[in-house]
Amino acid sequence: MTKRFIFQQILDQGIDRGFIPGKSEESRAWFREQASKLSTIRPERFMKRQGAIRNQVSNIWRPGELYLFRYDPLHKETLPYYDRFPLMMLIDTYTDGFMGLNFHYLPPLMRALLMERMYRFLNNENFDEKTRILLSYQKLKTLSGRPLYKPCLKRYLNNQVMSRFVKIHPAEWDMILMLPLDRFVKKRRSAVWRDSKTIYQGRK
């Protein structure tokens, strides 16, 4: 079981107030607001979690689960920028890698909006270890509103993963979206987010 040590205090406080993770829009907003105050959390801290899995995609992976890991792109010299710590929801796997949505390419509020839209594909509303989003590229294209997923859609190579994968517990999804865990190289996050905006607005 993924240990929820970073968010445990927030989870306990929320439950005491009657908020159940993921159960309602009000509940999700409360947990996001509390998590947004954790501005000093570093991605390296998550890498120390118990229960991290090996750094290769395997049959224990399922689309619609959320992971944090460290990545070093193969052709980074030719990329305009990249994120060294993707926060990725898995979409599909390949023999040499995998594809997913890296939420870091959107600012926190837009990450939350994208996640809200994808909740329509939840396999259950328990937000427990078995909860995942029944996600596919075809389903992403059916989401209402602007295609926020487009700048987030990335493909990764197994051999370029530089850490174990940390699976994010579903009860934490709404909170971790608010944290500044991205580590962009070559551009500041604000510039990356501006580029992403031009993509989902159809101007690039």
Each language-model region and where it sits:
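Mixed-charge, Lys/Arg-rich low-complexity intrinsically disordered regions
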Residues: T2-Y67
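Short, solvent-exposed secondary-structure boundary/capping segments
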Residues: D96-H104
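Intrinsically disordered, low-complexity, charged/polar segments
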Residues: L106-K204
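Generic structural motif
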Residues: D72-L74, T93, L106
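Hydrophobic beta-strand signal
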Residues: E65-K76
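Short beta-strand-centered aromatic/proline hotspots
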Residues: K76-T95
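N-terminal intrinsically disordered, low-complexity, charge/repeat-rich segments that act as generic
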Residues: M1-R28, M178-K204
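Hydrophobic beta-strand residues in large extracellular and virion-surface proteins
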Residues: Y67-F69, M88, G100
